[in-house]
Amino acid sequence: MLTTRKALYYLDKGKTKKAIRLLETCWKQEVTTENKRDIFTATVLLSDVLYQSGEHFPEIYQQLMSILEEMQDLEAVEFEREKAKQIFAELDEYFSEVGTFFQGDSLAELWLEFDYENDYKDVYPTPQRVAAIEAELGYKLPKSYIYLMRHTQNGGIVSTGSVPTTEPSSWSENCVAITGIMGIGNQGISALNGMHNTNFWIEEWGYPDVGLAIADCPSAGHDMVFLDYRNCGKTGEPAVVHIDQEADYKIMKLADNFEAFILSLYREEY
């Protein structure tokens, strides 16, 4: 158990990378009667750390499949066994939903690496974290929104930042521009329930209460993109709208749903 205890010490001190490097050595060891328990507990701990970070899902899946089959008879590790089963089940769900939304390579060039992308990003949205944020917000998030954040990255700056429109806005005659999409969480400043959340835009900037703010624009707050729940209720499938403060908070529909909104994004050529 020495490896696991040392890794827990590193994690408690915020030294996650050291803990991961230490625990990874267990994946490479040959299992014996003497080390079986230590390898099992270390593998489960490492799997949990990586899963919570949204990393190395195929490797975790294979490792958990292996140890769950080999160590059913191992005593005194019931907690770890149940944790392993939980992670394995959630990864099974993750892999089974691949391709549900955004067919083809439509997301290949969505995100842009930028200095302040972390304002929008948050920790990996496990099902438990998604449920907690939905409870905080009081809205059910679109499945395609959750899918995007789980299968690409949880918020950030977009490279394809133009959205076509059929009417003019304060930005352009035929499009609006967005800067970043808010990740699911409450740690990033511009995450869905971070400091610059929907309540901030409603209370401080006067935006109408139509649902959830999900993306900001280059105008630094003078126009925003929202999920519009007015017609579907807080648990329904919301439309995506643009709200223009410079035009007396004019509301313009951009897409029937979030998936259609993402698929409509393109890179403006100047």
Locate predicted features.
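Primarily a tetratricopeptide repeat
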Residues: R21, E59-Q62, S66
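Amphipathic alpha-helical segments of tetratricopeptide repeats
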Residues: W27-K28, M65-E69
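A surface-exposed partner-binding patch
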Residues: Q86-S219, E269
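TPR-repeat structural position
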Residues: T16, H56-F57
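Structural signature of alpha-solenoid helical repeat junctions
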Residues: D38, H56, A76, E80-K83
